Amino acid sequence: NSWGVPDGPMFQAVLDWIDERPEQPFFALAYTIETHHPYVAEPPLVEFQTKDEKHQRYLNAVRNADQQIAWLMEQLAARGLADDTLVVITADHGESFGQHNQTVHSFSVYESAVHVPLVMLHPALKNVPQRRIEQVRQQVDLPYTLVSLLGCRPPDAWQGQDLFAAEDRRAYFFSTGNNVACGIREGQYKYHFYIDSGHEELFDVLADPGELKNLATEQPQRCDEYRRRWGGLIQYQPGFLRRHGA
């Protein structure tokens, strides 16, 4: 891979590092890289077949990463570490394969590029009812939640909230591609505003997860409110304003 080593040797290196200090607490970040372009799984794996060769390679690379994570969990259990280790599986972005004429992930705020998985594994979570969190959450909530699960109080200055809290919340986001896109996700609605072109999009992502029906002209007041909120936020970004004439 152009970014690093295959996932198998990477996980083995993580375990070797853990084995060097068996009595010490540890924090390890394992960055699976086979799912990054050009999506090459090692060893080669073909469990999924699609008409799009790149998409097929990607799906099989994800499957291989899944198998490597399962192997890691088995190795932690064999070392007696499974009951003392909080494992988090997530991602820094999604990946697009033609949705909205977009590929990869760098220049889009559509769900295919920004929706990521989040799985947490630890025996202490047995007291937390297993459930799928349907409300809006952000990665900024993850450190806050992990520290709370470990029995510590997050610093007051930290942003984020407990992932398991019941209330819904609002998420702001943006992408600095050729046409900068800002957005807000609140409940079922997701709003996109393209700074350079002024184009707006509003989607009901529960009824329309593929973001195919733009509701902006049908709900102008909602768009006005979301644009106003973003305007208040970017006032704290003077360089951003100068660059885009906002």
Q: What residues fall within each predicted segment?
A:
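Solvent-exposed soluble domains appended to multi-pass membrane proteins
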Residues: 1-246
